[in-house]
Amino acid sequence: MRRRELLAALATQPLVVPLLDRLAAVAAIPPGRGSSRVRPGDPDWPSPAEWDGLRQRVGGRLIAVESPLQPCREAPIGEACRTLFRELKNPYYIGDEVGLTQTTGWVDAWTLEQSVFAVAAESAADVAAAVDFAREHNLRLVVRGGGHSYLGTSNSRDSLLIWTRRMAGIELHDAFVPADTNAAPLPAVTVGPGAVWGHVYNAVTTKGARLVQGGGCLTVGVAGLVLGGGFGSYSRLYGTAAASLLQAEIVTADGAVQIANAATNPDLFWR
Protein backbone atom coordinates (compact mmCIF):
# COMPACT_ATOMS: atom_id res chain seq x y z
CA MET A 1 0.00 0.00 0.00
CA ARG A 2 1.38 3.42 -0.96
CA ARG A 3 1.66 6.19 1.61
CA ARG A 4 -1.17 8.28 0.14
CA GLU A 5 -3.47 5.25 0.10
CA LEU A 6 -2.66 4.52 3.72
CA LEU A 7 -3.34 8.12 4.73
CA ALA A 8 -6.62 8.09 2.83
CA ALA A 9 -7.69 4.96 4.68
CA LEU A 10 -6.68 6.39 8.05
CA ALA A 11 -8.64 9.56 7.37
CA THR A 12 -11.87 7.58 7.75
CA GLN A 13 -11.00 6.43 11.28
CA PRO A 14 -11.98 8.34 14.48
CA LEU A 15 -8.47 7.87 15.88
CA VAL A 16 -7.07 10.29 13.33
CA VAL A 17 -9.15 13.26 14.46
CA PRO A 18 -7.30 14.12 17.70
CA LEU A 19 -3.99 13.42 15.97
CA LEU A 20 -4.77 15.95 13.26
CA ASP A 21 -5.81 18.49 15.90
CA ARG A 22 -2.45 18.02 17.62
CA LEU A 23 -0.56 18.36 14.35
CA ALA A 24 -2.41 21.58 13.58
CA ALA A 25 -1.43 22.96 16.97
CA VAL A 26 2.21 22.07 16.35
CA ALA A 27 2.12 23.67 12.91
CA ALA A 28 0.83 26.89 14.48
CA ILE A 29 3.94 27.38 16.64
CA PRO A 30 5.59 30.64 15.54
CA PRO A 31 8.97 30.43 13.79
CA GLY A 32 11.93 30.66 16.11
CA ARG A 33 10.47 28.47 18.84
CA GLY A 34 11.34 24.85 19.42
CA SER A 35 14.68 23.14 18.84
CA SER A 36 15.25 23.57 15.11
CA ARG A 37 18.68 22.47 13.94
CA VAL A 38 21.01 24.60 11.84
CA ARG A 39 20.90 23.65 8.16
CA PRO A 40 22.97 24.54 5.07
CA GLY A 41 22.21 28.10 4.03
CA ASP A 42 21.42 29.24 7.57
CA PRO A 43 23.59 32.08 8.92
CA ASP A 44 24.95 29.83 11.68
CA TRP A 45 25.94 26.97 9.38
CA PRO A 46 29.64 26.22 10.01
CA SER A 47 32.08 28.04 7.76
CA PRO A 48 34.58 26.18 5.55
CA ALA A 49 37.27 27.05 8.08
CA GLU A 50 35.24 25.50 10.90
CA TRP A 51 34.64 22.33 8.90
CA ASP A 52 38.36 22.22 8.17
CA GLY A 53 39.01 22.48 11.91
CA LEU A 54 36.87 19.38 12.47
CA ARG A 55 38.71 17.63 9.64
CA GLN A 56 42.01 18.26 11.37
CA ARG A 57 40.66 17.06 14.73
CA VAL A 58 39.69 13.70 13.21
CA GLY A 59 42.91 13.19 11.27
CA GLY A 60 41.50 14.10 7.87
CA ARG A 61 38.63 11.64 8.14
CA LEU A 62 35.86 14.17 7.41
CA ILE A 63 34.34 13.39 4.02
CA ALA A 64 31.70 15.06 1.88
CA VAL A 65 28.89 12.58 1.34
CA GLU A 66 27.92 12.02 -2.28
CA SER A 67 25.32 9.67 -3.68
CA PRO A 68 26.72 6.63 -5.54
CA LEU A 69 23.48 6.79 -7.54
CA GLN A 70 24.57 9.99 -9.30
CA PRO A 71 25.74 8.15 -12.48
CA CYS A 72 22.19 6.83 -12.89
CA ARG A 73 20.74 10.32 -12.61
CA GLU A 74 23.11 11.56 -15.29
CA ALA A 75 22.86 8.57 -17.66
CA PRO A 76 20.17 6.04 -16.63
CA ILE A 77 21.07 3.61 -19.39
CA GLY A 78 24.82 4.17 -19.28
CA GLU A 79 27.42 1.54 -18.47
CA ALA A 80 28.29 3.19 -15.14
CA CYS A 81 24.68 2.88 -14.01
CA ARG A 82 24.44 -0.76 -15.10
CA THR A 83 27.65 -1.53 -13.21
CA LEU A 84 26.30 0.19 -10.11
CA PHE A 85 23.09 -1.83 -10.13
CA ARG A 86 25.10 -5.03 -10.36
CA GLU A 87 27.04 -3.92 -7.29
CA LEU A 88 23.84 -3.06 -5.42
CA LYS A 89 23.01 -6.77 -5.27
CA ASN A 90 25.96 -7.15 -2.90
CA PRO A 91 25.01 -6.02 0.64
CA TYR A 92 28.67 -5.74 1.61
CA TYR A 93 29.17 -3.19 -1.17
CA ILE A 94 26.24 -1.20 0.18
CA GLY A 95 27.70 -1.35 3.68
CA ASP A 96 30.99 0.07 2.45
CA GLU A 97 29.31 3.09 0.79
CA VAL A 98 28.58 5.90 3.24
CA GLY A 99 25.93 7.32 0.92
CA LEU A 100 23.78 4.16 0.84
CA THR A 101 21.59 2.26 3.30
CA GLN A 102 20.51 -1.38 3.40
CA THR A 103 16.80 -0.59 3.81
CA THR A 104 14.18 1.91 2.68
CA GLY A 105 11.10 3.17 4.47
CA TRP A 106 7.87 1.18 4.45
CA VAL A 107 4.94 2.87 2.62
CA ASP A 108 7.23 5.80 1.74
CA ALA A 109 7.79 6.57 5.43
CA TRP A 110 11.28 7.84 4.65
CA THR A 111 13.66 8.03 1.72
CA LEU A 112 17.43 7.90 1.39
CA GLU A 113 18.84 11.42 1.69
CA GLN A 114 22.55 11.82 2.25
CA SER A 115 24.13 13.75 5.10
CA VAL A 116 26.26 16.74 4.13
CA PHE A 117 29.45 15.49 5.79
CA ALA A 118 30.49 12.30 7.53
CA VAL A 119 33.22 11.54 10.04
CA ALA A 120 34.67 8.15 9.09
CA ALA A 121 35.45 7.43 12.73
CA GLU A 122 38.30 5.13 13.69
CA SER A 123 38.22 5.71 17.45
CA ALA A 124 36.05 6.92 20.30
CA ALA A 125 37.99 10.20 20.12
CA ASP A 126 36.78 10.71 16.54
CA VAL A 127 33.20 10.07 17.66
CA ALA A 128 33.58 12.52 20.54
CA ALA A 129 34.95 15.19 18.19
CA ALA A 130 31.90 14.81 15.92
CA VAL A 131 29.51 14.94 18.88
CA ASP A 132 31.20 18.09 20.21
CA PHE A 133 31.10 19.78 16.80
CA ALA A 134 27.41 18.97 16.28
CA ARG A 135 26.52 20.22 19.76
CA GLU A 136 28.53 23.43 19.44
CA HIS A 137 26.95 24.28 16.08
CA ASN A 138 23.45 22.90 16.78
CA LEU A 139 23.64 20.41 13.90
CA ARG A 140 21.54 17.32 13.45
CA LEU A 141 23.70 14.28 14.19
CA VAL A 142 23.09 10.74 12.95
CA VAL A 143 25.06 7.51 13.34
CA ARG A 144 25.45 4.78 10.74
CA GLY A 145 26.94 1.37 11.39
CA GLY A 146 25.50 -1.37 9.22
CA GLY A 147 22.89 0.89 7.62
CA HIS A 148 19.92 -1.37 8.39
CA SER A 149 17.76 1.02 10.41
CA TYR A 150 14.11 0.42 9.50
CA LEU A 151 13.28 3.77 11.12
CA GLY A 152 15.47 5.74 8.72
CA THR A 153 18.04 6.71 11.34
CA SER A 154 21.02 5.61 9.22
CA ASN A 155 20.82 8.82 7.21
CA SER A 156 19.36 12.32 7.27
CA ARG A 157 19.63 15.29 4.97
CA ASP A 158 21.38 18.44 6.22
CA SER A 159 23.12 16.47 8.97
CA LEU A 160 26.56 15.42 10.18
CA LEU A 161 26.98 11.66 10.07
CA ILE A 162 29.18 9.54 12.33
CA TRP A 163 30.15 6.52 10.22
CA THR A 164 31.53 3.71 12.37
CA ARG A 165 32.33 1.24 9.57
CA ARG A 166 36.09 1.42 10.22
CA MET A 167 35.65 0.67 13.94
CA ALA A 168 35.26 -3.03 13.28
CA GLY A 169 37.79 -4.66 15.58
CA ILE A 170 36.98 -8.06 17.13
CA GLU A 171 38.91 -9.41 20.14
CA LEU A 172 38.20 -12.64 22.02
CA HIS A 173 38.77 -12.94 25.78
CA ASP A 174 39.13 -16.15 27.76
CA ALA A 175 38.32 -14.43 31.06
CA PHE A 176 36.73 -10.98 30.92
CA VAL A 177 35.74 -8.98 34.00
CA PRO A 178 33.79 -5.70 33.54
CA ALA A 179 35.61 -2.66 34.93
CA ASP A 180 35.20 -1.91 38.65
CA THR A 181 33.17 -5.04 39.33
CA ASN A 182 33.70 -8.22 41.30
CA ALA A 183 32.00 -10.31 38.65
CA ALA A 184 33.31 -13.77 37.87
CA PRO A 185 35.51 -13.93 34.76
CA LEU A 186 33.64 -15.01 31.64
CA PRO A 187 34.57 -15.85 28.05
CA ALA A 188 33.63 -12.77 26.04
CA VAL A 189 34.27 -10.86 22.85
CA THR A 190 34.90 -7.14 22.38
CA VAL A 191 33.34 -5.91 19.15
CA GLY A 192 33.69 -2.49 17.50
CA PRO A 193 30.50 -0.61 16.60
CA GLY A 194 31.19 -0.86 12.88
CA ALA A 195 31.45 -4.66 12.77
CA VAL A 196 28.70 -6.74 11.18
CA TRP A 197 27.51 -10.08 12.48
CA GLY A 198 28.98 -12.05 9.59
CA HIS A 199 32.48 -10.95 10.61
CA VAL A 200 31.74 -11.60 14.29
CA TYR A 201 30.49 -15.14 13.65
CA ASN A 202 33.56 -15.84 11.53
CA ALA A 203 35.90 -14.76 14.34
CA VAL A 204 33.96 -16.21 17.27
CA THR A 205 32.40 -19.39 15.88
CA THR A 206 34.33 -20.41 12.77
CA LYS A 207 37.79 -19.60 14.15
CA GLY A 208 37.20 -19.53 17.91
CA ALA A 209 34.77 -22.46 18.23
CA ARG A 210 32.49 -20.41 20.49
CA LEU A 211 28.98 -18.94 20.30
CA VAL A 212 27.87 -15.34 20.62
CA GLN A 213 24.21 -14.35 20.58
CA GLY A 214 23.49 -12.14 17.58
CA GLY A 215 21.10 -11.73 14.68
CA GLY A 216 20.34 -13.83 11.65
CA CYS A 217 21.28 -11.27 8.96
CA LEU A 218 25.04 -11.29 8.43
CA THR A 219 25.30 -7.67 7.23
CA VAL A 220 23.47 -6.10 10.19
CA GLY A 221 25.70 -3.97 12.40
CA VAL A 222 26.44 -5.25 15.89
CA ALA A 223 25.76 -1.97 17.71
CA GLY A 224 22.41 -1.36 16.05
CA LEU A 225 21.13 -4.85 16.79
CA VAL A 226 22.17 -4.68 20.45
CA LEU A 227 20.62 -1.24 20.93
CA GLY A 228 17.41 -2.54 19.36
CA GLY A 229 17.21 -5.45 21.79
CA GLY A 230 18.96 -8.06 19.69
CA PHE A 231 16.53 -10.91 19.08
CA GLY A 232 18.30 -13.74 17.27
CA SER A 233 18.06 -17.34 16.15
CA TYR A 234 19.01 -18.72 19.59
CA SER A 235 17.20 -16.20 21.77
CA ARG A 236 14.87 -18.85 23.21
CA LEU A 237 17.92 -20.61 24.63
CA TYR A 238 20.33 -17.76 25.33
CA GLY A 239 18.25 -14.58 25.47
CA THR A 240 18.81 -11.42 23.45
CA ALA A 241 22.06 -9.78 22.40
CA ALA A 242 21.26 -6.84 24.68
CA ALA A 243 20.90 -9.17 27.68
CA SER A 244 24.33 -10.64 26.89
CA LEU A 245 26.09 -7.28 26.99
CA LEU A 246 28.67 -7.06 29.77
CA GLN A 247 30.12 -3.60 29.16
CA ALA A 248 30.19 -0.82 26.58
CA GLU A 249 32.44 2.11 25.79
CA ILE A 250 30.14 5.01 24.94
CA VAL A 251 30.24 8.68 24.00
CA THR A 252 27.62 10.78 25.77
CA ALA A 253 26.01 13.95 24.41
CA ASP A 254 28.58 16.13 26.19
CA GLY A 255 31.37 14.45 24.20
CA ALA A 256 32.72 12.41 27.10
CA VAL A 257 34.04 8.90 26.47
CA GLN A 258 32.79 6.68 29.28
CA ILE A 259 32.45 3.06 30.35
CA ALA A 260 28.98 1.72 31.09
CA ASN A 261 28.34 -1.54 32.91
CA ALA A 262 26.40 -2.77 35.92
CA ALA A 263 28.72 -0.91 38.33
CA THR A 264 29.98 2.08 36.33
CA ASN A 265 27.34 4.47 34.97
CA PRO A 266 24.59 1.93 35.68
CA ASP A 267 21.97 4.52 34.70
CA LEU A 268 23.30 4.23 31.13
CA PHE A 269 23.31 0.45 31.28
CA TRP A 270 20.16 -1.66 31.04
CA ARG A 271 21.15 -4.82 32.89
Predicted segments with their positions:
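N-terminal accessory segments
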Residues: 2-239, 244, 258-261, 268-269
